[in-house]
């Protein structure tokens, strides 16, 4: 369901860690986005919708390209979303992850830092972002989120 389109209570449950575990904005790590905040927080498509459309080819999507419905579902799936401050969402807009990440200069934006790990973006996910590999990124991130959810249920 993390790579699909769940609805209702299932969607809300799966979104909880994605929305509430992140503490700082990616684009500007000085902006706190955790509750309570005065910032206007928006959900951002990590691989933006416009980017998906502009890069719809078999090189970018070797396993998904043949199925347009699957591509659309993956574009809007939960693991392609992350909370950002509204101003950061506007800065990122339709840019590829690699374009955005190449502009980061703050040490807090380095791989393995809280702004990534609190979003379930481990080093393998970060590498996929740097290489604009949405399939790898989403598969890796889905595993990270699912594992965290399972870990929370262990007694």
Spans of model-derived segments:
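Intrinsically disordered, low-complexity N-proximal targeting/linker segments that flank membranes
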Residues: 1-51, 55-56
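Context-gated lysine
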Residues: 11, 23-24, 53, 68, ...
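A generic structural signal for ordered alpha-helices
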Residues: 24-25, 63, 123
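Short beta-strand-alpha-helix junction that forms the catalytic/metal-binding core
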Residues: 41, 53-89
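Generic structural "secondary-structure junction" signal
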Residues: 48-49, 80, 94
